[in-house]
Regions:
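Long, hydrophobic N-terminal alpha-helical segment
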Residues: 1-52
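Intrinsic, low-complexity N-terminal interaction/targeting segments
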Residues: 26-34, 90-121, 138-141
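Short, well-structured hydrophobic secondary-structure segments
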Residues: 33-87
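Short, low-complexity cationic-aromatic patches
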Residues: 39-52, 110-115, 119-126
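Residues that cap or initiate secondary-structure elements
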Residues: 59-61, 86, 94, 113, ...
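Short acidic, gly/pro-rich beta-turn/loop elements at beta-sheet edges
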Residues: 63-65, 90, 131, 141
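A short, charged
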Residues: 88-94, 156-159
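Mixed-charge, glycine-accented linear interaction segment located at domain edges/termini
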Residues: 122-159
Length: 159
C-alpha cells in the first residue's frame, strides 16, 4: 500500500512574505512573535525610507513537524523590512547595544486620516518601536537555514 506525500515530506523552504494590508500584517505578526534580536541589529536607511531588523525568528510553522519527528524546535534568521518609513521613534529600547536582546511580541498597523499610518513593533518588557509610514508595506524574508532553538523549547506565555 502506498501513501500520498504530505506537505511535511517536502523540504522546508525559506519564507518570503509581504504585507500590504492589516490582514496580511497579522500573519507576519504571528510569525514574528517571540523573535529575538540584539538592539544593534536594527537599521533605518533614511534616504531609502526603509527600516530593517535581523531577527532570530521562532519557526511556529514547523511545530507540527518537530513534534511528530520528536526533534528540537527551530529558529531561523530573517529580515523584517518596513518600507516608506518617514520617522522612527522608540520607547524602552537602547539602540545600537549588542548586549541588549529584544523580543518581539507583535507587529501592528495604526492607519491615520492622511492615508499613511504607523507600524508598531511591541517588544517584551514595555519596549516599542513606532515607524511612521506613508503606506503599509512590510516584508519578512528568511535568510539562513533553520537551527535548533537554544532553549530547546517552544516559547510560552503563561497567563
Amino acid at each position: 500500500v502506498t501513501q500520498d506525500a504530505t506537505f511535511e515530506d517536502g523540504a522546508a523552504r525559506p519564507l518570503r512574505l509581504v504585507a500590504m494590508d492589516d490582514e496580511d500584517l497579522q500573519v507576519l505578526s504571528a510569525l514574528c512573535q517571540d523573535a529575538v534580536f540584539p538592539a544593534s541589529e536594527m537599521q533605518w536607511q533614511r534616504g531609502r525610507q526603509r527600516f530593517g531588523i535581523l531577527l532570530n525568528r521562532f519557526r511556529w510553522e514547523d511545530i507540527p513537524v518537530a513534534d511528530r519527528g520528536r526533534r528540537t524546535p527551530e529558529r531561523v534568521q530573517c529580515v523584517l523590512a518596513v518600507e516608506t518609513v518617514q520617522r522612527v521613534a522608540s520607547q524602552g529600547v537602547t539602540q545600537g547595544d549588542a548586549d541588549t536582546i529584544l523580543s518581539v511580541l507583535s507587529v501592528t498597523y495604526e492607519p491615520d486620516e492622511a492615508g499613511g499610518g504607523a507600524v508598531l513593533l511591541t517588544l517584551a518588557g514595555d519596549g516599542a518601536i513606532r515607524l511612521s509610514v506613508s503606506e503599509l508595506e512590510v516584508a519578512l524574508r528568511d535568510v539562513t537555514r533553520p537551527y535548533a532553538a537554544v532553549s530547546g523549547k517552544v516559547p510560552d506565555h503563561p497567563a
